[in-house]
């Protein structure tokens, strides 16, 4: 029904945003991966959307990239995975990380996502096997080389940097850098 929205970003309140399209405000739920990459309030934004109509609600879900939306649509087709759970999965893992977990059949990565238990994780791995390509990983952002780099990336995102900026800063760090020193170096690089 609604495939895309282009308008001004009026409000941001995780996980929801308000997009002003020609004087009409659309409330859109977005995964945190998209939320952290949104422009500043008042700037133009385009979101690919998926509209869910239920007996008690009509909810619009938005995504910055087509792979995110397609993955969301794959997830909600799986028994026991509704739109909120799918949004939670895409907030906890990038599409690339999810693809890598599916390829490696790594349920432990999926159970780290809030709301995903062992049985649901195993069902996801079974249902998505062969459907979600591992080749998506590098195209969507890939996986940090180490746990320290993953922690640095999370810290930078928590400080308000976009995922893209944070990934570029982490990529420029020496491989064996610790979390504390890595954050300091990344912040210096981002300040330039």
Curated annotation (Swiss-Prot):
User: Looking at the record, which segments are called Domain III?
Assistant: 144-192
Single GO cellular component term: Holliday junction helicase complex
> What are the alphabetically sorted keywords of the record?
Cytoplasm, DNA damage, DNA recombination, DNA repair, DNA-binding
Q: What is this protein called?
A: Holliday junction branch migration complex subunit RuvA
Q: Which CDD domains match?
A: UBA_RuvA_C
Where found?
A: Cytoplasm
The record's subunit annotation is: Homotetramer. Forms an RuvA(8)-RuvB(12)-Holliday junction (HJ) complex. HJ DNA is sandwiched between 2 RuvA tetramers; dsDNA enters through RuvA and exits via RuvB. An RuvB hexamer assembles on each DNA strand where it exits the tetramer. Each RuvB hexamer is contacted by two RuvA subunits (via domain III) on 2 adjacent RuvB subunits; this complex drives branch migration. In the full resolvosome a probable DNA-RuvA(4)-RuvB(12)-RuvC(2) complex forms which resolves the HJ.
Q: Which domain of life is it from?
A: Bacteria
Region (Flexible linker) residue ranges read: 139-143
Q: Which family does it belong to?
A: Belongs to the RuvA family.
**Mind telling me which Gene3D superfamilies this protein's record contains?**
5' to 3' exonuclease, C-terminal subdomain (1.10.150.20), DNA helicase RuvA subunit, C-terminal domain (1.10.8.10), Nucleic acid-binding proteins (2.40.50.140)
Q: Where is this region: Domain I?
A: 1-64
UniProt-annotated stretches for the region Domain II: 65-139
Species of origin reads Methylibium petroleiphilum (strain ATCC BAA-1232 / LMG 22953 / PM1)
Location (main, coarse): cytoplasm
The record describes the protein's role as: The RuvA-RuvB-RuvC complex processes Holliday junction (HJ) DNA during genetic recombination and DNA repair, while the RuvA-RuvB complex plays an important role in the rescue of blocked DNA replication forks via replication fork reversal (RFR). RuvA specifically binds to HJ cruciform DNA, conferring on it an open structure. The RuvB hexamer acts as an ATP-dependent pump, pulling dsDNA into and through the RuvAB complex. HJ branch migration allows RuvC to scan DNA until it finds its consensus sequence, where it cleaves and resolves the cruciform DNA.
Provide the domain comment.
Has three domains with a flexible linker between the domains II and III and assumes an 'L' shape. Domain III is highly mobile and contacts RuvB.
InterPro entries recorded:
DNA_helicase_Holl-junc_RuvA_I, Hlx-hairpin-Hlx_DNA-bd_motif, NA-bd_OB-fold, RuvA, RuvA_2-like, RuvA_C, RuvA_C_sf
Q: Does the keyword DNA damage apply?
A: yes
Q: Which GO terms describe its molecular function?
A: ATP binding; four-way junction DNA binding; four-way junction helicase activity
Does DNA repair count among this protein's keywords?
yes
Q: What's one GO BP annotation on this UniProt entry? A: DNA repair
């Amino acid at each position: 029904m609604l495939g895309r929205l282009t308008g001004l970003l009026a409000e941001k309140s995780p996980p929801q945003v308000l997009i002003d399209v020609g004087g009409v405000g659309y409330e859109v739920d977005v995964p945190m991966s998209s939320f952290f990459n949104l422009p500043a309030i008042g700037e133009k934004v385009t979101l690919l959307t998926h509209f869910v109509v239920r007996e008690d609600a009509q909810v619009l879900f938005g995504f910055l990239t087509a792979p995110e939306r397609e993955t969301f649509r794959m997830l909600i087709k799986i028994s026991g995975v509704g739109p909120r759970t799918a949004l939670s999965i895409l907030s906890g893992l990038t599409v690339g990380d999810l693809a890598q977990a599916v390829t490696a059949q790594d349920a432990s990565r999926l159970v780290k996502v809030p709301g995903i238990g062992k049985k649901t994780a195993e069902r996801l791995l079974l249902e998505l096997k062969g459907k979600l390509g591992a080749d998506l990983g590098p195209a969507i952002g890939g996986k940090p080389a180490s746990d320290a780099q993953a922690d640095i990336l999370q810290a930078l995102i928590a400080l308000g940097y976009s995922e893209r900026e944070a990934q570029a800063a982490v990529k420029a760090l020496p491989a064996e850098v610790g979390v504390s020193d890595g954050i300091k170096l990344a912040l210096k690089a981002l300040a330039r």
